[in-house]
């Protein structure tokens, strides 16, 4: 298993990016300003995009695993890679997600704790309703983990 930075042709991973953020123009807002990493384990299994949000905060903007390989530890391995790589350069690793029974427990298992909420984020910024595990996502829930 190896994790590599993608510096060119990031859109080749669009189908994977859209698993985590299903509207392409929203992905475009951070894809090229962020750093992208892919986890390769006999083929790409997982990707993430992180951005420098200032004030010592590194934010995971997108993280997704190829569906047949979900729940096998790939996303968690990618998060641990980020923690090790950016420790000392940033003080906080942050992620924003919907209030979903799928994502919140995953991030909490990875050591994140709830930080704050941006009300109506999904209803204000997406051109269609977003559902995950049958839950209509409205607010963006931010979680943080110290680096």
Question: Predicted regions span which residues?
Answer:
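Conserved N-terminal entry element of GNAT/NAT acetyltransferase domains
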Residues: 1-9, 141, 147
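Conserved GNAT acetyl-CoA-binding A-motif
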Residues: 85-99
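Conserved acetyl-CoA pyrophosphate-binding loop and the N-cap/start of the following alpha-helix
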Residues: 69, 73-81
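Conserved catalytic-core motifs of GNAT/GCN5-like acyltransferases
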Residues: 94-96, 108, 113-136
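Active-site-proximal loop/turn and secondary-structure-junction residues that shape catalytic pockets
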Residues: 64, 99-101
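Short hydrophobic/aromatic beta-strand or adjacent loop that forms the aromatic wall/cage
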Residues: 34-36, 137-142
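Acetyl-CoA-dependent GNAT
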Residues: 4-67, 79
């Amino acid at each position: 298993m190896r994790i590599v930075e993608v510096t060119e042709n990031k859109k080749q991973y669009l189908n994977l990016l859209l698993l985590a953020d299903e509207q392409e123009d929203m992905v475009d807002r951070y894809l090229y300003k962020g750093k992208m990493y892919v986890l390769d384990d006999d083929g790409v299994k997982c990707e993430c995009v992180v951005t420098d949000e200032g004030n010592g905060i590194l934010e995971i903007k997108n993280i997704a695993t190829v569906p047949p390989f979900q729940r096998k530890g790939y996303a968690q391995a990618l998060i641990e890679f980020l923690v090790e790589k950016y420790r000392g350069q940033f003080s906080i690793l942050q992620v924003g997600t919907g209030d979903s029974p799928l994502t919140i427990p995953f991030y909490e298992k990875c050591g994140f704790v709830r930080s704050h909420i941006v009300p109506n984020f999904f209803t204000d910024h997406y051109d269609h309703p977003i559902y995950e595990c049958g839950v209509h996502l409205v607010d963006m829930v931010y979680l943080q983990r110290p680096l």
